[in-house]
Amino acid sequence: MAKRKFPDLLHPIGGCGFIQFWKLYFNNWPYTLYSLPSRLLSLMAVTFRIPSVFFEKIRHKNAINSQEIKDGPIFIVGHWRSGTTHLHNLLSQDDQFAFITFSRSLMPLDCLGKLRPARALMKIMMPKNRGMDKVAIGPDTPQEEEFALAALGSVSFLKCLYFPRRIEEYFSSSVFLKCMSEQEKESLKSAYLYLTKKMTYANNGKTMLYKNPACTSRMSLLKEIFPNAKFVHIVRNPFEVFPSMMKLW
C-alpha cells in the first residue's frame, strides 16, 4: 500500500479575508484530521493578514472604486491543457498588458503592499514548478485569476479542488451559467469588477490580460460586466488534450 503523502501546508484559502474564510470553512464541513495542519496554518495566515487587509481597504478604496476600465480585459480561454498557460506567459511579455501575479491572485484583498513576509514564505513553501508539466511558478509569475475569485468569496472552479467531496456541485455552479443562481452570478460579477479595477489601478491603467479555462463558458456574462472585453480562444487537438487531462488528474 502506498504511503500517504503529507498534506500541502500552503493552502490557497489562507489568502481569503476573515469573513470569507469562515464562510468557506463552515459551508464545507466536516473535515478529516489529515487536513488539520493546513487548516490551522490557513487560519493563522488569515488572522495575521487582518491589519493589512483593513489598511489597504482604507487607503485605496476610493481610488479603486473610481478606476476606469477603458480597454479590455483580454481573456485567454480554452479547454484545460490546451496551452492557455503558455499563451498567457507569452502575451504577458508585452508591456501594453498587465497580468495578475501568483501572489496577488492568492491574496487579492491585501496585494497592493510589498507583502514581504507573505512573499518570502511563498518562495520557501511553493514548488519551483507545476508538477504536471514542469512550468515554472513563483510569487511574481503570471497566474489565472480564479484563485482571486475564490478568495473574494465568489463562485470559483478551484473550489472543486479545495473541497473535492462537492466537486460536481462546485463544477456546475462555477462553469455552467445555466446552473448558477442569480446570487452566484452577481457575486461573480462583483468579484470580477472589483479585481479588474484593483489590478488596473495597480498597473497604472494598463489593459488586463487574464487566462482562465473556466471562463470559456462564461463569456456572455463577462461581456455584461465588460462590454469592451476581448477573447482569445486557443484550441488543441482533442486527442492530445484528453491524455493530458488524464495525466493531470
PLM regions and their residue ranges:
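Hydrophobic/aromatic beta-strand patches that form the interior of the parallel beta-sheet core
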Residues: 74, 98, 230-232
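Short His-Asn-centered micro-motif
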Residues: 77-79, 209-213, 235
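Glycine-rich phosphate-binding P-loop
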Residues: 76-93
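PAPS-dependent sulfation machinery
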Residues: 104-208
